[in-house]
């Protein structure tokens, strides 16, 4: 370990944690920083505004967290039905790129271009599938979801959380705010 690494570990003791423990520390930092300040499901832009003052790395993590959940529970297109506020969409794409997930950012942008124009037609869950299938787009959404989910490496099956860990270890000053 060189002097710079030793100094960084002294300043950021959480870097000595395991990946799983570091992920918990990041979630704790996010909870303190964003907490219940704004609702990411809202269309009012408050969530994007709330994360806008965070350090760039923590901001990227706050913006991409909900995409990870969408990839796990739904699909990359459905994400925009829950988290489609334009400011949050921009923050998420920028966040993916900041975290070194350029490929996922491309899949994300393509999925947004597919789903966003159709949102006015989607009133209920069944409408989403019917709308995309009737246009031959559901297969592409599934492909984009599979590609984004399969990006390696992953932590607990998540390429996004693995990127958080890699980023936090490489740039702790852009994540931790004490």
Language model features: what each stretch is:
Residues 2-64, 68-74, 81-89, 95-178:
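Extended, alpha-helix-rich binding/interface surfaces that flank or overlap catalytic cores
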């Amino acid at each position: 370990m060189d002097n710079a690494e030793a100094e960084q570990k002294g300043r950021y003791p959480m870097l000595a944690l395991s990946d799983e423990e570091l992920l918990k520390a990041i979630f704790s930092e996010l909870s303190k920083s964003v907490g219940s300040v704004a609702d990411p499901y809202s269309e009012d832009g408050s969530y994007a505004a709330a994360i806008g003052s965070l350090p760039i790395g923590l901001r990227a993590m706050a913006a991409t967290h909900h995409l990870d959940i969408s990839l796990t529970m739904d699909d990359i297109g459905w994400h925009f039905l829950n988290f489609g506020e334009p400011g949050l969409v921009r923050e998420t794409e920028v966040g993916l790129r900041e975290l070194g997930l350029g490929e996922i950012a491309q899949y994300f942008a393509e999925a947004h271009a597919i789903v966003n124009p159709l949102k006015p037609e989607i009133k209920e869950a069944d409408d989403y599938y019917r709308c995309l299938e009737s246009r031959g787009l559901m297969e592409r959404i599934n492909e984009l979801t599979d590609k984004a989910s399969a990006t390696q490496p992953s932590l607990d099956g998540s390429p996004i959380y693995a990127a958080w860990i890699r980023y936090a270890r490489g740039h702790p000053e852009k994540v931790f705010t004490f």
